[in-house]
Amino acid sequence: MKIYVWDNHTLRELLGISLILLLVGLGTVFSGNRCFLSCFLLVFSAKDQDYDKLCRFFFWFFFATLLLNLLLVGAGVLEDTLSTRWEAINFGATRHSYGFGHPNTFGFWTLLLIFSGLLYIPRKGHRALSCLISVLLAFCVFRVTDSKAALLSSLAAIVLCLIAFRVGPWLSSKKWSVPLCLGLYLLGIAAFLSLALLYREGSSFFSTCNALLSDRLAYSSAAFRSFGVKLFGAQVHFRWDPVDSLYAYAPICMGLIPTVLYFGLNLISIYRAAKAGRWDIVAVAFAGALYSTMEYGLMNPVHLPIFAACARLEVEKDRKSSV
């Protein structure tokens, strides 16, 4: 209702939004998964909302959720489910979930807290402290979850944000910076898909890449061969460990058209953030792209960079004007 009545869209914009929601809705019907539809609805509803306020809300929401879960585990209400790492890297490690059901889910929520914290505390005086706390949190959670995807993506976000804070004004002065970011984002997706589609078990190169990505290449390759890709997805029941990479899970389960629209939304977000000089948002978007090579959790409407597609962004150089 807000999108169509109160957001003051033009007729052309409303027709475009309606078409997108129709296509994503068809994908929801065929796949039985509402994640993409929820993403688009919430992002469209965020039109002209203050982006920094959204970051603040999500930060405290993620913080409260993590704290509540830990308290409930300590009180014996929730169970700390344990599992063992059976992959080559860190074989035999005990992994804790602390009330989230799976260690990777605990790592995912910590990742979301770090992402939102990096975007919520952008002031120069607080950047170093924010990054230091994020590093300590990432390693502490990794010690108990052994979630490599969450650790690597958290560290990537921290490093990229530090670089963005330093060279952001210089990047904003270069006309090639925005096309370069968009191209690199697409190149990363294309690289993973190429490796998955060309994957061969006997190759030492592919075996090394597969080990680094916690067997995601092998599972993705097998899924593409077994199930293929449909325009609007399907309710796929995997007979082996789930295909966790978003770049494989989305086209197979959610459908080609909804997947293209979703990543198109990500590209628009990166474009608007870069144009506004908000290179911290671009940095977190790239860290999220790294995480998506191993997990599909960011297909839920919790990845803050995608809200930059419609929300009001304060221009970094003066923090007064907005786009």
Segments predicted by a language model, with ranges:
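Membrane-interfacial helix-loop-helix modules of multi-pass inner-membrane proteins that assemble, modify
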Residues: 67-103, 207-208, 235
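Membrane-interface helix-loop-helix junctions at transmembrane boundaries of multi-pass membrane enzymes
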Residues: 6-15, 122-130, 175, 270-284
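Alpha-helical transmembrane segments of multi-pass inner-membrane proteins
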Residues: 56-77, 101-145, 151-159
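Transmembrane alpha-helical segments and their membrane-water interfaces
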Residues: 21-64
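Hydrophobic transmembrane alpha-helices and their immediate junctions
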Residues: 256-289, 311-319
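TM-adjacent membrane-interface loops and short helices in multi-pass inner/ER membrane proteins
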Residues: 211, 215-242, 250, 254-260
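Transmembrane signal-anchor hairpin modules in multi-pass inner-membrane enzymes, especially those
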Residues: 1-22, 121, 315-323
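A membrane-periplasm/extracellular boundary helix in multi-pass inner-membrane enzymes
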Residues: 162-207
